[in-house]
Swiss-Prot record:
GO terms for molecular function: glutamyl-tRNA reductase activity; NADP binding. Substrate binds at residues 49-52, 109, 114-116, 120. The keyword NADP applies. Coiled coil: none annotated. The keyword Isomerase does not apply. The active site is at 50 (nucleophile). Pfam families: GlutR_dimer, GlutR_N, Shikimate_DH. It catalyses: (S)-4-amino-5-oxopentanoate + tRNA(Glu) + NADP(+) = L-glutamyl-tRNA(Glu) + NADPH + H(+). It comes from Prochlorococcus marinus (strain MIT 9313). The gene is hemA. This is Glutamyl-tRNA reductase. InterPro entries: 4pyrrol_synth_GluRdtase, 4pyrrol_synth_GluRdtase_dimer, 4pyrrol_synth_GluRdtase_N, GluRdtase_CS, GluRdtase_dimer_dom_sf, GluRdtase_N_sf, NAD(P)-bd_dom_sf, Shikm_DH/Glu-tRNA_Rdtase. The record marks 99 as: Important for activity. One of its GO terms (biological process) is protoporphyrinogen IX biosynthetic process. Homodimer.
Length: 436
């Protein structure tokens, strides 16, 4: 068995490729079942965010397993192999484990150290458990990754003042406003007519950062108006006007700055729509949805400026240097957590031998106990029989404790295999199985 991950991220693929591979929660079960149905894949879980799609698996054979996952991604995206392959990465075993730890800690994020990725890894664990696509190996790995992410944020400075995709989007708007005025600095949004389209987690973070940046008010649109009103209630100090998504045209006609973050599969704003509107001002669109909510052709419309998640690099690079130093602190934690998981994985090699040893001793115990009880006669009470049986089981457990502990302890693989062979020979057990 082998741990493997195949995927792509903001580091390897532009948003126009990433959006084709995005797997929304409503189709996650189908995707997991499809992958789990492949005889090469024993366990699987999927991490799908605006900046990455990564499929973590336990496979029978690394090359064949990775090939099966790549085939699935090609079918899911509709992209030809030659168009998709250059954007994919894959890691096997210890590299896959180390990569997941980095992802959960936020060290592989566009915004270094951002906290939202940890929530997304938790969601990956929850969906994998709900849809029963994970077994003991991935459960252990992903649970430890979540713990690692928490540990990095509590034991290092990386989580201090960490920014997110949403906060970077707000800063990008401030930067573009400043550049439009001939200043390469962040400008206040106080005079902007701002709208947020969508009422999910990203929109919540947008409202949080807009309020912190001094925004004077926001128009909040959502398909379900009630959800928008529920969200706005959490920001009593920020004037929020809630509207249904049907009022999108009005929003685009009156606002000067519009953020979009919906779960729509197709763009909700394109050039043909904007050309029909009588706009009152210059319109700046910032789209943090994946798939994208804003069609790429809007840049052809006069008086319209559009940015997507890939454009966040411009603002993120301005404050990454200090965070790079903080990331070095986190690397120590990641190396330790990766080592701990791999030691646990190596210890699994001893499990078949331990189980056979326990079964052998249990059979001997049961046989000898039965012989002894048969000689006790009818005067031996049921209570006394239970006491003797418990005594015999306790003796077996005491005998097994030290050898089992030693077989599971961290050690070089050749030494462990030699110990397993000795135990198997002494107790006439079957040879231990090799664990890849």
């Amino acid at each position: 068995m082998h741990i493997a991950v195949v995927g792509l991220s903001h580091r390897t693929a532009p948003v126009e490729i990433r959006e084709k591979l995005s797997i929304p929660e409503q189709t996650m079960e189908t995707s997991l079942q499809t992958l789990r149905g492949n005889d090469q894949i024993l366990e699987v879980s999927i991490l799908s965010t605006c900046n990455r799609l990564e499929i973590y698996t336990l496979v029978r054979h690394p090359e064949r397993g990775i090939s099966a996952i790549s085939d699935f991604l090609g079918q899911h995206s509709g992209l030809a192999t030659e168009d998709l392959s250059p954007h994919l990465f894959n890691f096997h075993h210890d590299e896959a484990v180390a990569h997941l730890m980095r992802v959960a800690a936020g060290l592989d994020s566009l915004v270094l150290g951002e906290g939202q990725i940890l929530s997304q890894v938790k969601k990956m664990v929850r969906l994998g458990q709900e849809h029963k696509s994970m077994g003991p190996i991935l459960n252990r790995l992903l649970t430890q990754a979540v713990s690692t992410g928490k540990r990095v944020r509590s034991e290092t400075n990386l989580g201090t003042g960490a920014v997110s995709i949403s906060s970077a989007a707000v800063e990008l708007a401030q930067l573009k406003l400043g550049q439009a005025q001939g200043e390469d600095q962040l400008m206040t949004l106080e005079s902007e007519l701002v709208a947020v389209v969508g009422a999910g987690r990203m929109s919540r973070l947008l409202l949080q950062h807009l309020q912190a940046k001094g925004c004077s008010g926001v128009m909040l649109l959502n398909r379900t108006r009630q959800r928008a009103e529920d969200l706005s209630a959490d920001f009593p100090e920020l004037p929020v006007e809630c509207r249904p998504l049907d009022d999108l045209n009005h929003c685009l006609s009156t606002c000067s700055l519009v953020f979009t973050s919906t779960a729509a599969d197709d763009p909700i704003v394109d050039a043909s729509l904007l050309k029909q509107l009588k706009r009152r001002s210059f319109l700046r669109l910032i789209d943090i949805g994946v798939p994208r909510n804003i069609a790429s052709d809007v840049v052809d419309v006069p008086g319209v400026e559009s940015h997507d998640v890939d454009d966040l690099h411009e603002v993120v690079s301005r404050n990454q240097e200090a965070r790079q130093q903080m990331a070095k602190e986190a690397e120590v934690v990641l190396q330790e957590e990766t080592r701990l998981f791999l030691e646990w994985w190596d210890s699994l090699e001893a499990v078949p031998t331990i189980n056979r040893l326990r079964a052998t001793l249990e059979a001997i115990r049961a046989e000898e106990l039965q012989k002894a009880l048969s000689r006790m006669g009818p005067d031996f009470s049921a209570r006394e029989r239970k006491v003797v049986e418990a005594l015999s089981k306790g003796i077996i457990n005491k005998i097994l404790h030290t050898p089992v502990t030693q077989l599971r302890a961290p050690q070089a693989r050749p030494e462990r295999q030699q110990a397993l062979r000795v135990v198997a020979s002494l107790f006439e057990l079957d040879p231990p199985l090799e664990n890849g």
